[in-house]
Regions:
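Structural/interface elements that position substrates and couple domains in central-metabolism enzymes
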Residues: 16-166
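Cysteine-centered motifs
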Residues: 2-4
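Extracellular/secretory pathway and lumenal proteins
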Residues: 6-8, 160
Length: 166
């Protein structure tokens, strides 16, 4: 049998080495799985966070609550180029620029705007990506899961933390 095609595919698609059955286990839906993920996480980068001037918006008050719950929040805003700190923390413009490891990337982007961030997420290699309530992009989720990253979609981190008593 010729293995040329397999070799070429492995070179072209290095992030898709996980079998179909395996990557689906990284799509987290169950409360117990979310609880386990949150219990073993401390550092959460918030992609699409908004500054204090937008305190009435979920992209600000959810990360603020997350910080109050004891997590380290790392702001990664998409807009607001003049803002240098949010929630008292230095701002990073790309996930790959954040020093150290990231446990969870909490995403506040419209579903159609998630795919352009996937390469940055993959370069940083967080343990998990959490897409907020109303945010679901199955193609991005599959790509992340195939790379070994756990994915939560369409769930509010604040609501889940409150519901779980964490």
């Amino acid at each position: 049998r010729c293995t040329c095609a397999r070799t070429i595919l492995a070179a072209v698609l290095p992030m898709t080495t996980t079998s179909s059955a395996d990557w689906r286990t990284r799509l987290i839906n169950a409360t117990e799985e979310m609880r386990a993920l949150l219990r073993r996480s401390r550092r959460i980068a918030v992609l699409g966070i908004k500054p204090e001037t937008r305190a009435d918006q979920p992209a600000y008050f959810v990360p603020a609550y997350t910080m109050e719950a004891g997590f380290e929040v790392i702001p990664v805003p998409v807009y607001y180029p003049d803002v240098t700190t949010i929630l008292g923390q230095p701002v990073y413009r790309r996930l790959v620029d954040v020093p150290g490891e990231i446990d969870i990337v909490n995403v506040f982007r419209r579903p159609e705007h998630v795919p352009p961030h996937v390469d940055d997420i993959l370069a940083k290699r967080p343990r998990a990506v959490w897409m907020q309530l109303g945010i679901r992009n199955d193609d991005a989720a599959e790509r992340l899961a195939r790379a070994g990253i756990e994915v939560v979609q369409d769930r509010c981190l604040k609501v889940e933390l409150m519901r779980m008593g964490l």
